[in-house]
């Protein structure tokens, strides 16, 4: 799905210009501290948003960053393939060519020896490419909602020849798509539109959530991330709970929390690209049995948005919602620009100036 400028985004740019003009006229030039909390269930795209801030508002990834992400790309790639191989057994799927079993064993052996962060040997690379090309593996990949698989599996496995090259260096997109579970709290600082941002990315898995409480004081706004594509998947940490239901429950508790009575809440309905692909094959009724609309991107996404908005029990609290694709830098740049304008407008309203 392309991420071109929508009417809503063009309006946001116009609003942005107007607010900047107001600020200049009012002579409010003292830089203000903004504390942003990134919340959401595990694997909703929070850390990818942080990486985008590094690209958009800092200097992107340094040579040192690229070096550090290289083993992560190797690991994400081979671990994804190993997860598909393991699911072949669980789901009882046969390989298109039974000789692939030897290739599968080689992949699983590398993972069990914990050599997954190392460059692929020529033999291993050939085995991985043969496996990814196998019809049984592809059938198993198409059923990935039935087991746990990294969202970037296809992206990396489609690029095996490039990632397996001797002179491989991760690209910006490779780095954006890496998946490392966030433990604890990661703080990022940057300045934009005369505001000093302190952005806190908090681990989304259930075990990490108790660490959020320290961040609750004087938060300017919360960005709550939801993986739209999680509607037909279960949690890593609890395979009986649907990911979208978990997100809704968590959003309810954040949105109506006494700590956040006066905090702006910005909802990022993320992974809209994956959702757009998935909704063609996997009906929304998997998650919402009462849904009677069509399985088009527009209708299904609007229904999910309404489910989240209905959790807000405060009549004077507004939820600002954006459909996002966290791996698309242009999309996040436009959306974050609009988010900043909301923060500025709310700040001015607080001072009676807007």
UniProtKB/Swiss-Prot annotation:
Residues 174-182 are annotated as: G2 motif. GO terms for cellular component: cytoplasm; heterotrimeric G-protein complex. Mg(2+) binds at residues 47, 182. It catalyses: GTP + H2O = GDP + phosphate + H(+). This is Guanine nucleotide-binding protein G(o) subunit alpha. Its EC number is 3.6.5.-. It comes from Bos taurus (Bovine). G proteins are composed of 3 units; alpha, beta and gamma. The alpha chain contains the guanine nucleotide binding site. Forms a complex with GNB1 and GNG3. Interacts with RGS14. Interacts with RGS16. Interacts with RGS19. Interacts (when palmitoylated) with ADGRG3. Guanine nucleotide-binding proteins (G proteins) function as transducers downstream of G protein-coupled receptors (GPCRs) in numerous signaling cascades. The alpha chain contains the guanine nucleotide binding site and alternates between an active, GTP-bound state and an inactive, GDP-bound state. Signaling by an activated GPCR promotes GDP release and GTP binding. The alpha subunit has a low GTPase activity that converts bound GTP to GDP, thereby terminating the signal. Both GDP release and GTP hydrolysis are modulated by numerous regulatory proteins. The modification 5-glutamyl histamine is found at residue 205. The GTPase activity is promoted by GTPAse activators, such as RGS14, RGS16 and RGS19. Residues 266-273 are annotated as: G4 motif. Residues 324-329 are annotated as: G5 motif. GTP binds at residues 43, 46-48, 152, 176-179, 270, 273, 325.
């Amino acid at each position: 799905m392309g991420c071109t400028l929508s009417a809503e985004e063009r309006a946001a740019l116009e609003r942005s210009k107007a607010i900047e003009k107001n600020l200049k006229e009012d002579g409010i030039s003292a830089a203000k501290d903004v504390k942003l909390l990134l919340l959401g269930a595990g694997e909703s795209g929070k850390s990818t948003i942080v990486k985008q801030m590094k690209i958009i508002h800092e200097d992107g990834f340094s040579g040192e960053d690229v070096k550090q992400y290289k083993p992560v790309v190797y690991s994400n790639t081979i671990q994804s393939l190993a997860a598909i191989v393991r699911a072949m057994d669980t789901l009882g799927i046969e390989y298109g060519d039974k000789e692939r079993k030897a290739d599968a064993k080689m992949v699983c052996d590398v993972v069990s020896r914990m050599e997954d962060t190392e460059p692929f040997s020529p033999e291993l690379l050939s085995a991985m490419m043969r496996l990814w090309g196998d019809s049984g593996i592809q059938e198993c990949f198409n059923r990935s909602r039935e087991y746990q698989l990294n969202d970037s599996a296809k992206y990396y496995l489609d690029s095996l020849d490039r990632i397996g090259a001797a002179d491989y260096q991760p690209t910006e997109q490779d780095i954006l798509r890496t998946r490392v579970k966030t433990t604890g709290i990661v703080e990022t600082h940057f300045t934009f539109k005369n505001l000093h941002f302190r952005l806190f990315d908090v681990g989304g898995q259930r075990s990490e959530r108790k660490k959020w409480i320290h961040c609750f004081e004087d938060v300017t706004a919360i960005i709550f991330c939801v993986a739209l594509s999680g509607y037909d998947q279960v949690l890593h940490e609890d395979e009986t709970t649907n990911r979208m239901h978990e997100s809704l429950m968590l959003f309810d508790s954040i949105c109506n929390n006494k700590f956040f009575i006066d905090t702006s809440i910005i909802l990022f309905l993320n992974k809209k690209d994956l959702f757009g692909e998935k909704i063609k094959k996997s009906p929304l009724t998997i998650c919402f049995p009462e849904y009677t609309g069509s399985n088009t991107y527009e209708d299904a996404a609007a229904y999910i948005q309404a489910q989240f908005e209905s959790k807000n029990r405060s009549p004077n609290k507004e939820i600002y919602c954006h459909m996002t694709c966290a791996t698309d830098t242009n999309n996040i740049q436009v959306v974050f620009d609009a988010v900043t304008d909301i923060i500025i407008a709310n700040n001015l309203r607080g001072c009676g100036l807007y």
